[in-house]
Structure formats: structure tokens, C-alpha cells
Amino acid sequence: MDFYRINEEYNQYLQRYEKEKRGVTKVPNIRYTDRNKFAFGAVMQVNGINYYVSVSSFDKKQEANILIRVPGDEKEIKGSLRFNYMIPVPEACIERLVIKEVEDGKYRLLLNKEYQFCMDNAERIQKKANKIYEMVTTNRKQKLTDNSCAFRILEQGYREYIENVLRTKC
């Protein structure tokens, strides 16, 4: 498991795909003014499809997230992993984020702390990913399902993207 940047074109494709099939999309934006959002993964695999969860600055505890806390400073929450917004990503559409190549020193330090948290909690993260996936796909809690990506729809979009976009590029 590692930090990755997800291809913007693919992310936008999933947003359009989910909106077309569901009427709304919960696929998070990854483009921000100062830097693009990145993801941690693969947090789980379903039918050979790897899922990645965004690392977010959101700092409120919710059922579908894990707060990222800095070791030795439990009160300082650095962000969260928001599992209701995890997405399936083909290997061709991710690029490993090399922390030591990040130029902004403060941001690089934050990334190192977040990465260490994720690695120290990898098993917990994988369990949470599987639990939220199961809860959403079986509609165990309507409010959670409504506020989550439609994982099965995204899996279909993932397959269609590979078939219609990636195969034609090769």
C-alpha cells in the first residue's frame, strides 16, 4: 500500500458515469488550486478490482471514515480516510506519489506523518474499507448509501473505461 495520484481524466470519467447512471455523483474532486488530492491504497480488492481511498483534510469523526492522528499528538487530527468515497482504479490510471520529491517542506512533513499513520493502521484500514463496501452495497443504512459512491455502478464504469478507453490507447 502506498500514496497515489489518480489520473484526472479517469476521475472525471467516473464522475460523469455515476451521475449518468444514478443522477448524482459522490466521486470526489481531485483538482484543487494548490495541489491535487491523493489516495491511499489499494485498501481492498473486489473481483480483481483495486479500490483506493482519498486522503482528505476532513477532520470530523464519522462512521465511514478513519481520522488520521499524528503519533505523540493525539489531539491534532491531520485529516481522514473517507471510505464512502473510495473508488475503483485501474493500475494504468494511478501514479505513485513519491513523498521525498515533494518540494514544499511543510507539506512533505505532513505527507510523511499521514503515510506513517496509514502504514501503522493498514489492517484496520482494510477492515474498514471492506465493512463500508459491504454496508453500502447491501444498503444496510440508507443514509450511508445515499452519501456514498455507488460502488457497483463505479465498478461497471471501471470495466467500461478499460474496455473503451485504455484498450484503444494500447
Where is each model-derived feature located?
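Compact nucleic-acid interaction/catalytic patches
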Residues: 30, 34, 45-83
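C-terminal terminal-subdomain/extension
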Residues: 74-170
